[in-house]
Amino acid sequence: PNGRLIAYVSTGVLWVIPVTPGGDPLGPPRRLTNELADDPTWAGDSESIVYLTTDRLRRVWLTDGRIEDIPVALWWQRSTPTGRVVVHAGALFDGVSESLHRNIDIVIDGNRIVRVDPHDEALHVGEIVDATDGVVSPGLIEMHTHGDLASGEQLGRTWLSYGITSIRIPAGDPYDVVEARESIGSGRRIGPRIFGTGGTIDGSRIYYSGASSLASSAQVGLEMERAAALRYDLVKTYVRLPDAVQRRVITEAHALGMPVTSHELYPAVANGADGVEHVSGTSRRGYSTKVTALNRSYQDVVQLLAQSGMTITPTVGISGGYALVTVDDPSLFDDPRVTTFSPSAPQAVRLRGDLETSRRLVQDMASTLRRVVEAGGVVVMGTDSPINPQGLSLITEMEALVRYGGMSTIDAMRATTSISAAAMGYGREFGSVRPGMLADLVVFGANPLENIRAARDVRTVVKNGRVFQLDQLLQGPSR
């Protein structure tokens, strides 16, 4: 404020440098912290700077370098429903089996499934969900989405309206992710379970704003401190981070029990990376090691994925799959969820070239995922929304892989339920329907194992034991 110093963050820590009134440096910079610093703010008297470090707010005094904590009274309490809910399923896809179970009662106590038994009228005590004319499935899981977490309560309703009860955010503002996770967990807002991380860990020249810029491998430890303090569910490295530094990130993240994903297949696979995002996508090499310019992947790509056990999140939709599905079936846009949550979606569709060229490009890319599954690899379902609309993009991703790539409907449904849950390390908590699991369910009006388009027809959603009808989600909270 007095015009004599500029405060800035470099190499992850806080510095000041003396300047002229015109902003020219007058001397060497002075380092103020040895810990990560975000959002520095000058005090009005220019005597101190307030900054955010991992999970604390602190003040550093310029006179003597003293650092003090600023107490912030923040707390939250997880909301767990009580009571009994019974879902009477005409048919049940349990997340794993190739065939449906018929006439099943799913008994929920609080937020856990306690029984999955053949229908028995004597079990029907408590809140009853009549799904006798539908197919019950585990809640769907969106494994690659970003943004809009601070935009209000509507986004949570959007996800749930498409049957999505868990989302994974592989890059985002870490404090937005924590706030959304805690708000939903406390019951203040409704929405899916949120699993996420902070900004991407990138090189000295970042690709996207919000990324952590690592000038050297020495910063890796600082980033891992933040990851541990904010309880990241994963770490994502990005396209300008050198391979050697990525290897160190993988080692240190694994020591914390956190998986690592990136856009890179090789040498990331040799360095122990756990996942790869996008069949296409940007790369630090300037070209993709996963797919050619014609959207074709060679057999070595399939073999590396299948034999390593790395997960791959396709996001075929952002490479033309979403546009092709909607052009082939524009009735998608008549859905009340689209008109309510994504009214501009029809105007945003762009094909890559003419229709037949677009179709061939999508078919070639989507078929890679079928080949990976057939070779024993792990495909999870994600979209990179909101490039394409949240919720809708996951349904069209599933359809694109089945319709254009030849993936079976059972593999598409498993990828969006049990396989994605297991890939996040929560296969014993959700993603399938059996006693002991968290009560995350979706009721479809038809059988997605017969026709994947049935995944569009969401009637009822159960998230953490709480029942939501589609009409309720479309209307929003009472005013």
Residue ranges and their predicted role:
Residues 98-137:
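Histidine-rich, glycine-flanked metal-binding segment
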Residues 131-143, 147, 151-262, 266-281, ...:
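Divalent-metal coordination cores built from histidine and acidic residues
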Residues 223-241, 282, 287-405, 478-479:
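Active-site neighborhoods of metal-dependent hydrolases
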Residues 1, 10, 16-39, 62-79, ...:
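Multi-bladed beta-propeller domains
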Residues 1-2, 44-45:
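Residue-level detector of Asp-centered blade-edge/turn motifs that repeat once per structural unit
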Residues 93-105, 118, 389-392, 407-413, ...:
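Acidic, glycine-enriched loop/beta-strand segments at the rims
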Residues 57, 90, 106, 111, ...:
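Divalent metal-coordination and catalytic microenvironments
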Residues 3-6, 49:
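Hydrophobic beta-strand positions that form the internal "hydrophobic ladder"
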